Amino acid sequence: AKLNQGQNFSRLMSFAMYGPKSPATNLLTEAELTNMNPQELVDRIHNQNSYKHRILYYGPSSSKDLLATINQYHQVPAVLKDIPAGNEYAYLETPVTKVLVAPYDAKQIYMAQISNLDKKYDPAIEPIRALYDEYFGGGMNSIVFQEMRETRGLAYSAWASIMPPSYLKYPYVLRTQIATQNDKMIDAVTTFNDIINNMPESEAAFKLAKDGLTNRLRTERIIKGDIIWSYINAQDLGQNVDPRIKLYNDIQNMSLKDIVDFQKQWVKGRTY
């Protein structure tokens, strides 16, 4: 992994988001693995059903038959134990801009920016956030891709997104990233920051973004086992309805001005 630029960059991103202790560092050392008793791991596997848990099922059985099968084969204690608290990794705040550099001998640089927006999940802003992402930093028709790669040739890849939390306790995070040649770094970083803060306005690009998001919502299907996970994901965010309903309905009446106003409030002038 140390010889892979992408892996090194991924660890740098984890450090930038969480600090010295992150999900990426939650690993056993070689000494800990060597000294570990294998039977302890086997016992942990055997004891998993003694903790509180949910059973997810997708298949042809009726609820009656399924419950009969579970009662017959899923052996658990009469009283289940609470799940032990796991490690918590909080996003670092970004009150001032800080630059982290990880030297790596390569022909191109990876540059990313992370800003903790310090705002919790809000279903009311999800439609405009999704449309902003589609317009500004999404696919090949987005402002970032067109400006950084197609028009100026300053990056191999470029994207930007306001990433929504997966749980209510986490904040929204603004994340941007480019990969470019070493000799284009200064121009690429300068231009990238300029379009992030002074977002170009294009009615044509907005129409492509709106139509693209609308068409994707029209044709997207959540099927089979994904239905269960979509339901659980909604529950994790305190929701009991499919968020795509509001997303689809709300974006139909949105204009480029809505995107511009959102960008000024949520993105312009951020520290990373």
Model regions: which residues?
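Charge-rich, well-structured scaffold segments of protease-associated domains
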Residues: 1-83, 157-272
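Generic alpha-helical structural context detector
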Residues: 14-15, 133, 137, 146, ...
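Basic side chains
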Residues: 2, 98, 149-152, 210
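A generic structural signal for short, solvent-exposed coil/turn residues
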Residues: 47, 92-94, 103-105, 150-152, ...
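A structural supersecondary motif
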Residues: 112-116, 137-179
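His/Glu-based metal-binding/catalytic segments typifying zinc-dependent metallopeptidases
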Residues: 82-143
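Intrinsically disordered, low-complexity segments enriched in polar/charged residues with Gly/Pro
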Residues: 20, 42, 86-89, 133-135, ...
